[in-house]
A protein has these predicted regions:
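Metal-dependent enolase-superfamily TIM-barrel catalytic cores that perform enediolate-based chemistry
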Residues: 132-243
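Metal- or metallocofactor-binding catalytic centers and their adjacent structured scaffolds
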Residues: 3, 8, 40-125
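Structured beta-strand/loop patches that form or line metal/cofactor-binding pockets in enzymes
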Residues: 1-48, 52-56, 330-335
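Conserved, mostly hydrophobic/aromatic
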Residues: 6, 37, 44, 71, ...
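A cross-domain feature marking catalytic cores of carbohydrate-active enzymes
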Residues: 51, 145-148, 170-172, 197-201, ...
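C-terminal extensions of enzymes
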Residues: 337-372
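Shared catalytic-loop signature of beta/alpha-barrel
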Residues: 213, 219, 227-248, 253-348
Length: 372
C-alpha cells in the first residue's frame, strides 16, 4: 500500500448537559464532553479519532485548539507510510513545547486522538477492519457496564442488565458505609455476575490498607486505582500483599517506559491503557502486546464519546484481552456513533468486517451540542 498525504485535519468539540452528574471520588462531571478528530487524505479517504477530555471541566476546547492550531499544520506536505510514523513525529516535535508549558497530558491526548483517526484512515485504505489489521482473529468480546455512580447504583445496574450487560463496575471511595451498602444492593441484584469497583485514586495508603480487605467479602473481579497512580511502588506492593482481589490500573499511566515499569513490578493483574488519553492505537497496541506477553489481563479503559469507545473495542479484539468498558450513563455523543458496541447481547458484542473503525459519524445529528 502506497503512502498518503493528509489534506485536512480538524477537531470538533461537543458537550452534552447531564441531568444526573457523573460522580467520582475526586470530582464530578456536569456535562459529557467529546472531542472528535477528522482526517482526510488527498485521495478523499478519511478517518475518525477521539481525544480524552473529561477533566478539567474546561479542557476539551483547549485540546481542540491544540489540534487545529498546532498539530494540523505539521501535516503539510508530509507523505505518510504508516500511522506510527506520525505518532512518533508529533510526539517528538511537541515535546519541548509540552515540557515548557507543563502540558504533557493535553498534548499526549491530542496526539492520541489524531493517531486513532490516522489508523482508521489507514485501515480503510487497506479495506480491512482495524481489529483484523492489528492481528485479531475474532471481533467478539465481553463487555461490562461502567461508571455506576454511588447514587442510584442498583437502578443504573438494572437498566444496564436490561440492555444486555452481564458484568458491572461500581464507583467507590465515598466512605465504607455507603460503599458497602451499594455493593450489597448490587450483589442482591446481579447475584454472582462479575462485579468490579473503582476508587478513582481516592484513598491514601492508610485507608486503602484498612478498606480494601473488607471488600473481599463481595468477591470482586478487580479493585481499580485504589491509591494515586503516582504513589511509590512500595505502597502498591504493600497493598497487594494484604488482599487477594486483583488490582487494576493504567488509565493514568502514560508512555511505553512507564507501562514497562508497571509490568516489571508485577502488581497490576488488570492493565488498562486509555487509547484516547495516551498512545492512540500506536502506543496502546504496543502496550497491549506486552500486557498479554506478561500474562496479565488487558482491559482498555474508556469513558467518553462513541468513536473512542469503538477504537477501544478494536484494540481489545486485536489483542484478545479481557473486558471492554462501556459507560452505563446517558450520553448521546457515545450512543449515536458506537455502532456494534451499542448492541450488547448476553454480555458480549461483536465487531464486523467493515473497513477501519466501521462507523461513519454524522456530526450534523449532534450539532446542537457543538461548542467549537
Amino acid at each position: 500500500m502506497t503512502g498518503f498525504k493528509i489534506r485536512k485535519l480538524e477537531a470538533f468539540c461537543f458537550r452534552y448537559p447531564l441531568s444526573t452528574p457523573v460522580v467520582t471520588s475526586f470530582g464530578r462531571m456536569n456535562d459529557r464532553p467529546a472531542l472528535f478528530v477528522h482526517a482526510e487524505d488527498e485521495d478523499g479517504q478519511h478517518g475518525w479519532g477521539e481525544v480524552w477530555c473529561n477533566f478539567p471541566p474546561v479542557g476539551a476546547e483547549h485540546r481542540a485548539r491544540l489540534i487545529n492550531e498546532m498539530l494540523a499544520p505539521m501535516f503539510a506536505g508530509r507523505a505518510i507510510d504508516h500511522p506510527s510514523e506520525m505518532f512518533d513525529y508529533l510526539t517528538a516535535a511537541t515535546s519541548v513545547m509540552a515540557l515548557q508549558a507543563g502540558e504533557q497530558g493535553p498534548f499526549a491526548q491530542a496526539i492520541a486522538g489524531v493517531d486513532i483517526a490516522l489508523w482508521d484512515l489507514f485501515a480503510r485504505r487497506s479495506k480491512q477492519p482495524l481489529w483484523r489489521m492489528l492481528g485479531g482473529t475474532s471481533g467478539r468480546m465481553r463487555v461490562y457496564a461502567s461508571g455506576i455512580n454511588p447514587d442510584g447504583s442498583a437502578q443504573t445496574a438494572e437498566k444496564a442488565m436490561q440492555r444486555g450487560h452481564r458484568a458491572f463496575k461500581l464507583k467507590i471511595g465515598f466512605g465504607a458505609e455507603r460503599d458497602h451498602a451499594n455493593l450489597r444492593d448490587l450483589r442482591q441484584l446481579i447475584g454472582d455476575l462479575p462485579l468490579a469497583v473503582d476508587v478513582n485514586q481516592g484513598w491514601s495508603i492508610g485507608p486503602a490498607l484498612e478498606q480494601a480487605p473488607k471488600l473481599e467479602q463481595f468477591h470482586l473481579l478487580w479493585l481499580e486505582e485504589p491509591i494515586r497512580a503516582d504513589r511509590p511502588w512500595s505502597e502498591w506492593h504493600t497493598l497487594r500483599d494484604k488482599i487477594t482481589t486483583p488490582i487494576a490500573g493504567g488509565e493514568n499511566i502514560a508512555g511505553r517506559e512507564k507501562f514497562a515499569a508497571a509490568l516489571s513490578e508485577d502488581i497490576l493483574s488488570v492493565v488498562q491503557p486509555d487509547a484516547a488519553k495516551w498512545g492512540g492505537i500506536t502506543g496502546c497496541s504496543a502496550v497491549a502486546r506486552e500486557v498479554v506477553k506478561a500474562k496479565k489481563t488487558y482491559c482498555p479503559h474508556y469513558l467518553g464519546g462513541g468513536i473512542g469507545l469503538v477504537a477501544s473495542a478494536h484494540l481489545l479484539a486485536a489483542h484478545n484481552g479481557g473486558w471492554l468498558e462501556v459507560d452505563a450513563n446517558e450520553n448521546p455523543l457515545r450512543d449515536a456513533f458506537c455502532g456494534a458496541v451499542g448492541r450488547v447481547k448476553d454480555g458480549e458484542i461483536e465487531l464486523d468486517e467493515t473497513p477501519g473503525l466501521g462507523i461513519e459519524p454524522d456530526l450534523a445529528s449532534i450539532a446542537k451540542y457543538r461548542t467549537l
